[in-house]
Amino acid sequence: MPRTIIEKLWDSHVVHERPGAPTLLFIDLHLVHEVTSPQAFQGLRERGLKVRRPDLTIATADHSIPTTDRSLPIVDEIAAKQLAQLETNCKDFGIRCLGVHSSQQGIVHVIGPELGLTQPGMTVVCGDSHTATHGAFGALAFGIGTSEVEQVLASQCLLQRKSKTFQVKVDGALKAGVSAKDIILALIARIGIGGGTGSVFEYTGSAIRALSVEERMTVCNMSIEGGARAGLIAPDDATFEYLAGRPHAPKGAAWDAAIPRWKQLPTDDGATYDRSVSIDADTLEPMITYGTNPGMGVSINAALPDPSQVSDPMARDSITKALAYMGLEGGKPLVGHPIDVVFIGSCTNSRISDLRTAAGLLKGRKVSPKVRVMVVPGSQEVKRQAIAEGLPEIFRAAGCDYREPGCSMCIAMNGDQLAPGEYSVSTSNRNFEGRQGKGGRTFLASPLTAAASAITGVVTDVRTLL
């Protein structure tokens, strides 16, 4: 019987199943960070348990790590305690830790792929919502809670209920100024933040195949914002080329054996999905969010929804409240709205290709004196590559604050945050109330839109600067 890649990945990792109960799955890679792991490690201590497979577990410091000078003491006591505890826990349980001063430190969803830890056919979990990023390699990757982190540490297995299959087919070609971030923002605006509930997305189509592997990571990263458990893309030659030679990728005969196996993963001809949706890439425009969840998105020049024209009372109330929090008026476009901060970074858009894109637009230009611009590479490796290409000099010459790797303003628990009432154009993935700082107001967009808005000081259609 023909199967989707989602079904193949599930079937190949079943340890035990019985009717009406969750299935026990084997986990190939467990990624750990400092925020959701302390209670899990403490649970192991209290129960006298060891980590079952430390060789399949790796930790990094990312959420609460400062993006300022690493030679200085960490001022935030909670952050300092979390980061120190991570290193202690990893030492006690024999887990490799890419800590504050590691040359491989970075955002967990950046370092996994760049080190070659993430590979096709794997199950990957992490105590973080955006673990779906790793699905760009043809892996079944999803976020888990702290109690589940403890379960995986103790057993290398996890109880899960099987998700439905959801095909997101994107055909056509993206126009200049339109990017992978716009694909996923357009999808979420269309289906809503609950549209994928109970499902795993498989992204297919010519527009997806045309994306680089790093762009595919951006798309998969925000699957959770569309309500999905995970999102993935079948591996192809681009995937294999990306992985070849990376530190933890197979080598020699193991590599030669892996390729034919990985080529069996794509969805079979004739396989069916529980649900499908199609997007025409030819018609997509730069996207931006206006409200307080990622589903509140519009094309850059479109008018914002007018609550008085919305018939559904719940939707009308939600839009009314969002516009009030954001200080916006329905029926008018966002283009031209003043901003205070631009953030280029996060596990969605902090890879070297993202920095290249932003630097390409900023080169020879200056950012608005009214705007504070933060550029935060996703890892030490991205930082090194950016230096080799001269990107920090471009950002600094333009007037940007170029910082050390970490989650930074995406989550505002590390000193990088908005002041109450400030507006940001952000390349991150969530725009909830207070997400980037108490009272802060976030517009989610692509690196191109963010860089363009940094130059003008207002929300800007990047196509006017190309």
UniProtKB/Swiss-Prot annotation:
Its EC number is 4.2.1.33. [4Fe-4S] cluster binds at C347, C407, C410. GO terms for molecular function: 3-isopropylmalate dehydratase activity; 4 iron, 4 sulfur cluster binding; metal ion binding. Pathway: Amino-acid biosynthesis; L-leucine biosynthesis; L-leucine from 3-methyl-2-oxobutanoate: step 2/4. Gene3D superfamilies: Aconitase, domain 3. Pfam families: Aconitase (PF00330). It catalyses: (2R,3S)-3-isopropylmalate = (2S)-2-isopropylmalate. SUPFAM superfamilies: Aconitase iron-sulfur domain (SSF53732). Its cofactor is [4Fe-4S] cluster. HAMAP family: LeuC_type1 (MF_01026). Belongs to the aconitase/IPM isomerase family. LeuC type 1 subfamily. Heterodimer of LeuC and LeuD. Catalyzes the isomerization between 2-isopropylmalate and 3-isopropylmalate, via the formation of 2-isopropylmaleate. PANTHER family: 3-ISOPROPYLMALATE DEHYDRATASE, HOMOACONITASE, MITOCHONDRIAL-RELATED. This is 3-isopropylmalate dehydratase large subunit. It comes from Solibacter usitatus (strain Ellin6076).
